[in-house]
Amino acid sequence: MKSLFSYLVIFLLLFIYSSKHELKYKDTFEPVFSTYKTDSAGTLAPVEKDEIFYGLLTPVEICAIFNRLGVPYNNATLNPTSNRDQYLSSSKASINTGIYGVDFGYLKMFGIGQEMINYMVTIRDMSNKLGIPDNFLTEPIKRIQADMSEPDTIMSLMNDAFTKMEDHLRAGGRESTAGLMVMGGWVEAMFIATQLVYNPAKPDPEVVEKIAEQKYTLTTLLSFMKNYYDDPVVVYYTKKLKFLKNYFDTFDIYFKKGDLEIDRSKQVFRSSGSEMTVTVETLNKIRDYVSKLRTEMVTP
Protein backbone atom coordinates (compact mmCIF):
# COMPACT_ATOMS: atom_id res chain seq x y z
CA MET A 1 0.00 0.00 0.00
CA LYS A 2 1.35 3.43 -0.93
CA SER A 3 1.63 6.27 1.54
CA LEU A 4 -1.49 8.09 2.70
CA PHE A 5 -0.23 11.26 1.05
CA SER A 6 0.02 9.35 -2.23
CA TYR A 7 -3.54 8.08 -1.99
CA LEU A 8 -4.99 11.49 -1.24
CA VAL A 9 -8.33 14.11 -3.49
CA ILE A 10 -8.83 12.94 -6.12
CA PHE A 11 -7.49 8.70 -5.85
CA LEU A 12 -6.65 1.80 -7.98
CA LEU A 13 -9.84 1.97 -10.10
CA LEU A 14 -10.80 -1.68 -9.47
CA PHE A 15 -13.68 -1.81 -11.91
CA ILE A 16 -12.34 0.40 -14.71
CA TYR A 17 -12.58 -2.40 -17.25
CA SER A 18 -15.91 -3.82 -16.10
CA SER A 19 -18.96 -3.32 -18.31
CA LYS A 20 -20.54 -1.00 -15.80
CA HIS A 21 -17.63 1.44 -15.67
CA GLU A 22 -15.93 0.87 -19.03
CA LEU A 23 -14.36 3.80 -20.84
CA LYS A 24 -16.59 5.13 -23.60
CA TYR A 25 -15.51 6.19 -27.05
CA LYS A 26 -17.11 8.77 -29.28
CA ASP A 27 -20.06 7.70 -31.32
CA THR A 28 -22.80 9.82 -32.90
CA PHE A 29 -24.15 12.13 -30.21
CA GLU A 30 -24.26 15.79 -29.20
CA PRO A 31 -21.96 16.52 -26.25
CA VAL A 32 -22.90 19.22 -23.78
CA PHE A 33 -19.24 20.05 -23.10
CA SER A 34 -16.11 19.29 -25.12
CA THR A 35 -12.44 20.01 -24.47
CA TYR A 36 -11.19 18.78 -27.85
CA LYS A 37 -9.47 21.48 -29.87
CA THR A 38 -11.01 22.00 -33.29
CA ASP A 39 -7.70 21.19 -34.99
CA SER A 40 -6.76 18.25 -32.74
CA ALA A 41 -7.75 15.65 -35.32
CA GLY A 42 -6.43 15.17 -38.82
CA THR A 43 -3.24 17.20 -38.36
CA LEU A 44 0.34 16.03 -38.65
CA ALA A 45 1.54 17.96 -35.61
CA PRO A 46 1.46 15.94 -32.38
CA VAL A 47 -1.18 17.03 -29.89
CA GLU A 48 -0.19 17.36 -26.26
CA LYS A 49 -2.31 15.10 -24.09
CA ASP A 50 -3.64 15.96 -20.67
CA GLU A 51 -3.50 13.53 -17.77
CA ILE A 52 -6.65 12.35 -16.03
CA PHE A 53 -5.92 10.90 -12.60
CA TYR A 54 -8.15 7.97 -11.74
CA GLY A 55 -6.24 7.10 -8.58
CA LEU A 56 -6.45 8.86 -5.22
CA LEU A 57 -4.81 12.26 -5.64
CA THR A 58 -2.08 13.63 -3.43
CA PRO A 59 -2.31 17.22 -2.18
CA VAL A 60 0.60 17.96 -4.52
CA GLU A 61 -1.40 16.66 -7.51
CA ILE A 62 -4.52 18.48 -6.32
CA CYS A 63 -2.44 21.63 -6.03
CA ALA A 64 -1.20 21.20 -9.62
CA ILE A 65 -4.77 20.85 -10.91
CA PHE A 66 -5.86 23.92 -8.95
CA ASN A 67 -2.93 25.79 -10.49
CA ARG A 68 -3.94 24.84 -14.04
CA LEU A 69 -7.52 25.88 -13.38
CA GLY A 70 -6.48 29.21 -11.93
CA VAL A 71 -8.15 28.72 -8.56
CA PRO A 72 -8.29 32.13 -6.82
CA TYR A 73 -7.14 32.79 -3.27
CA ASN A 74 -10.02 32.69 -0.81
CA ASN A 75 -9.14 31.43 2.64
CA ALA A 76 -12.76 31.83 3.74
CA THR A 77 -13.45 28.61 1.82
CA LEU A 78 -11.00 26.63 3.96
CA ASN A 79 -11.73 24.93 7.26
CA PRO A 80 -10.56 27.42 9.93
CA THR A 81 -7.74 26.18 12.14
CA SER A 82 -9.73 27.47 15.11
CA ASN A 83 -12.05 24.47 14.70
CA ARG A 84 -9.34 21.97 15.60
CA ASP A 85 -10.00 21.96 19.36
CA GLN A 86 -13.64 21.05 18.76
CA TYR A 87 -12.95 17.75 16.98
CA LEU A 88 -13.07 15.42 19.95
CA SER A 89 -13.90 12.06 18.37
CA SER A 90 -11.33 9.96 16.53
CA SER A 91 -13.46 9.91 13.37
CA LYS A 92 -13.81 13.70 13.26
CA ALA A 93 -10.10 14.11 13.89
CA SER A 94 -9.30 11.63 11.09
CA ILE A 95 -11.58 13.25 8.52
CA ASN A 96 -10.43 16.77 9.28
CA THR A 97 -6.76 15.83 9.25
CA GLY A 98 -7.35 14.95 5.58
CA ILE A 99 -9.29 18.18 5.05
CA TYR A 100 -6.57 20.30 6.62
CA GLY A 101 -3.99 18.48 4.49
CA VAL A 102 -5.69 19.61 1.27
CA ASP A 103 -6.16 23.13 2.68
CA PHE A 104 -2.42 23.21 3.32
CA GLY A 105 -1.73 22.18 -0.28
CA TYR A 106 -4.10 24.89 -1.50
CA LEU A 107 -2.34 27.59 0.54
CA LYS A 108 1.03 26.45 -0.80
CA MET A 109 -0.05 27.74 -4.23
CA PHE A 110 -0.02 31.31 -2.98
CA GLY A 111 3.35 31.37 -1.25
CA ILE A 112 4.67 30.53 2.16
CA GLY A 113 3.61 32.48 5.21
CA GLN A 114 2.31 32.26 8.73
CA GLU A 115 -1.08 30.99 7.59
CA MET A 116 0.59 28.00 5.99
CA ILE A 117 2.55 27.34 9.20
CA ASN A 118 -0.70 27.53 11.17
CA TYR A 119 -2.19 24.74 9.07
CA MET A 120 0.91 22.60 9.57
CA VAL A 121 0.65 23.08 13.34
CA THR A 122 -3.05 22.22 13.14
CA ILE A 123 -2.31 18.99 11.26
CA ARG A 124 0.22 18.11 13.95
CA ASP A 125 -2.30 18.80 16.72
CA MET A 126 -4.98 16.76 14.95
CA SER A 127 -2.60 13.84 14.48
CA ASN A 128 -1.82 13.98 18.21
CA LYS A 129 -5.50 13.30 18.88
CA LEU A 130 -5.08 10.15 16.83
CA GLY A 131 -2.16 9.02 18.96
CA ILE A 132 0.42 9.87 16.31
CA PRO A 133 3.75 11.15 17.72
CA ASP A 134 4.04 14.90 17.22
CA ASN A 135 7.69 14.67 16.18
CA PHE A 136 6.50 13.49 12.75
CA LEU A 137 5.46 17.09 12.09
CA THR A 138 7.42 19.07 14.67
CA GLU A 139 10.71 18.65 12.81
CA PRO A 140 9.27 19.69 9.40
CA ILE A 141 7.68 22.74 11.04
CA LYS A 142 11.00 23.79 12.58
CA ARG A 143 12.83 23.37 9.27
CA ILE A 144 10.22 25.36 7.36
CA GLN A 145 10.22 28.16 9.93
CA ALA A 146 14.00 28.34 9.57
CA ASP A 147 13.90 28.46 5.76
CA MET A 148 10.67 29.28 3.94
CA SER A 149 12.28 29.91 0.54
CA GLU A 150 11.72 26.48 -1.03
CA PRO A 151 8.03 25.56 -1.58
CA ASP A 152 8.91 22.21 -3.18
CA THR A 153 11.01 21.26 -0.15
CA ILE A 154 8.03 22.02 2.06
CA MET A 155 5.78 19.64 0.14
CA SER A 156 8.48 16.97 0.26
CA LEU A 157 8.74 17.35 4.04
CA MET A 158 4.97 17.11 4.40
CA ASN A 159 4.90 14.05 2.16
CA ASP A 160 7.43 12.36 4.44
CA ALA A 161 5.43 13.36 7.51
CA PHE A 162 2.19 11.89 6.17
CA THR A 163 4.01 8.70 5.17
CA LYS A 164 5.20 8.28 8.75
CA MET A 165 1.69 9.01 10.02
CA GLU A 166 0.19 6.33 7.82
CA ASP A 167 2.86 3.79 8.74
CA HIS A 168 2.13 4.45 12.41
CA LEU A 169 -1.61 3.90 11.88
CA ARG A 170 -1.06 0.71 9.90
CA ALA A 171 1.33 -0.67 12.50
CA GLY A 172 -1.40 -0.19 15.09
CA GLY A 173 -4.08 -1.88 12.97
CA ARG A 174 -5.94 1.39 12.38
CA GLU A 175 -6.28 1.35 8.60
CA SER A 176 -9.85 2.70 8.80
CA THR A 177 -8.46 5.91 10.30
CA ALA A 178 -6.28 6.31 7.22
CA GLY A 179 -9.35 5.65 5.05
CA LEU A 180 -11.29 8.46 6.71
CA MET A 181 -8.37 10.83 6.17
CA VAL A 182 -8.32 9.98 2.45
CA MET A 183 -12.06 10.55 2.19
CA GLY A 184 -11.87 13.90 3.97
CA GLY A 185 -9.14 15.06 1.62
CA TRP A 186 -11.11 14.11 -1.50
CA VAL A 187 -14.27 15.84 -0.32
CA GLU A 188 -12.30 18.99 0.53
CA ALA A 189 -10.67 19.03 -2.92
CA MET A 190 -14.10 18.70 -4.56
CA PHE A 191 -15.47 21.44 -2.31
CA ILE A 192 -12.72 23.90 -3.22
CA ALA A 193 -13.04 23.14 -6.94
CA THR A 194 -16.83 23.44 -7.08
CA GLN A 195 -16.93 26.56 -4.92
CA LEU A 196 -14.03 28.57 -6.34
CA VAL A 197 -13.64 27.70 -10.03
CA TYR A 198 -17.00 26.32 -11.16
CA ASN A 199 -19.31 29.06 -12.44
CA PRO A 200 -22.80 27.71 -13.28
CA ALA A 201 -23.68 30.92 -15.12
CA LYS A 202 -20.73 30.50 -17.49
CA PRO A 203 -19.16 27.06 -17.01
CA ASP A 204 -15.64 26.63 -18.34
CA PRO A 205 -15.37 23.33 -20.28
CA GLU A 206 -11.99 22.50 -18.71
CA VAL A 207 -13.34 23.08 -15.20
CA VAL A 208 -16.38 20.96 -16.01
CA GLU A 209 -14.07 18.26 -17.36
CA LYS A 210 -12.03 18.11 -14.14
CA ILE A 211 -15.16 17.88 -12.00
CA ALA A 212 -16.75 15.27 -14.27
CA GLU A 213 -13.58 13.14 -14.26
CA GLN A 214 -14.03 12.66 -10.54
CA LYS A 215 -16.60 9.97 -11.35
CA TYR A 216 -13.59 7.67 -11.92
CA THR A 217 -11.94 8.80 -8.70
CA LEU A 218 -15.14 8.37 -6.71
CA THR A 219 -15.42 4.78 -7.92
CA THR A 220 -11.87 4.22 -6.71
CA LEU A 221 -12.57 5.86 -3.36
CA LEU A 222 -15.64 3.69 -2.77
CA SER A 223 -13.63 0.56 -3.57
CA PHE A 224 -10.92 1.74 -1.19
CA MET A 225 -13.43 2.38 1.61
CA LYS A 226 -14.91 -1.12 1.26
CA ASN A 227 -11.83 -2.47 3.00
CA TYR A 228 -12.87 -0.82 6.26
CA TYR A 229 -16.53 -1.74 6.69
CA ASP A 230 -15.77 -2.90 10.22
CA ASP A 231 -15.83 0.80 11.15
CA PRO A 232 -19.43 2.12 11.41
CA VAL A 233 -18.29 5.66 10.56
CA VAL A 234 -16.77 4.39 7.31
CA VAL A 235 -20.04 2.62 6.50
CA TYR A 236 -22.00 5.81 7.23
CA TYR A 237 -19.94 8.00 4.92
CA THR A 238 -19.73 5.33 2.24
CA LYS A 239 -23.53 5.50 2.00
CA LYS A 240 -23.23 9.27 1.57
CA LEU A 241 -20.66 8.85 -1.19
CA LYS A 242 -22.83 6.27 -2.95
CA PHE A 243 -25.63 8.82 -3.01
CA LEU A 244 -23.24 11.35 -4.56
CA LYS A 245 -22.21 8.73 -7.11
CA ASN A 246 -25.81 8.60 -8.35
CA TYR A 247 -25.31 12.08 -9.81
CA PHE A 248 -22.09 11.06 -11.55
CA ASP A 249 -23.81 7.99 -12.97
CA THR A 250 -26.27 10.19 -14.90
CA PHE A 251 -23.67 11.24 -17.47
CA ASP A 252 -20.90 9.76 -19.60
CA ILE A 253 -17.47 10.93 -20.70
CA TYR A 254 -16.43 10.03 -24.25
CA PHE A 255 -13.00 9.81 -25.86
CA LYS A 256 -12.12 9.65 -29.54
CA LYS A 257 -10.97 6.24 -30.70
CA GLY A 258 -7.21 5.97 -30.75
CA ASP A 259 -6.78 9.08 -28.62
CA LEU A 260 -6.83 7.52 -25.16
CA GLU A 261 -3.75 6.08 -23.42
CA ILE A 262 -3.82 4.31 -20.05
CA ASP A 263 -0.80 4.36 -17.72
CA ARG A 264 -1.56 1.84 -15.00
CA SER A 265 1.68 2.47 -13.11
CA LYS A 266 0.84 6.15 -12.58
CA GLN A 267 -2.94 5.59 -12.52
CA VAL A 268 -3.67 8.10 -15.25
CA PHE A 269 -5.47 8.32 -18.58
CA ARG A 270 -3.93 10.53 -21.25
CA SER A 271 -6.12 12.17 -23.85
CA SER A 272 -6.10 15.33 -25.95
CA GLY A 273 -9.65 16.01 -24.81
CA SER A 274 -13.01 14.52 -23.96
CA GLU A 275 -16.70 15.07 -24.57
CA MET A 276 -19.33 14.89 -21.85
CA THR A 277 -23.08 14.57 -21.64
CA VAL A 278 -23.18 16.21 -18.21
CA THR A 279 -25.61 19.09 -17.74
CA VAL A 280 -25.30 22.22 -15.62
CA GLU A 281 -28.22 20.97 -13.54
CA THR A 282 -26.29 17.81 -12.65
CA LEU A 283 -23.13 19.79 -11.89
CA ASN A 284 -25.11 22.04 -9.57
CA LYS A 285 -26.47 18.99 -7.75
CA ILE A 286 -22.94 17.64 -7.34
CA ARG A 287 -21.73 21.01 -6.05
CA ASP A 288 -24.60 21.34 -3.58
CA TYR A 289 -24.30 17.79 -2.25
CA VAL A 290 -20.53 18.08 -1.83
CA SER A 291 -21.07 21.33 0.06
CA LYS A 292 -23.64 19.69 2.32
CA LEU A 293 -21.38 16.70 2.98
CA ARG A 294 -18.37 18.87 3.65
CA THR A 295 -20.35 21.06 6.08
CA GLU A 296 -21.29 17.93 8.00
CA MET A 297 -17.66 16.83 8.11
CA VAL A 298 -16.23 20.10 9.42
CA THR A 299 -19.04 20.73 11.92
CA PRO A 300 -17.90 19.56 15.39
Where are these regions (language model features)?
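Extended amphipathic alpha-helical interaction segments
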Residues: 150-238
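Secondary-structure edge/capping motif, primarily at the C-terminal ends of alpha-helices
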Residues: 104-111, 130, 168-172, 193-201, ...
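Bacterial Sec-dependent N-terminal signal peptides
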Residues: 1-32
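Generic structural signal for well-ordered, non-transmembrane alpha-helical segments
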Residues: 98, 102, 114-117, 121-124, ...
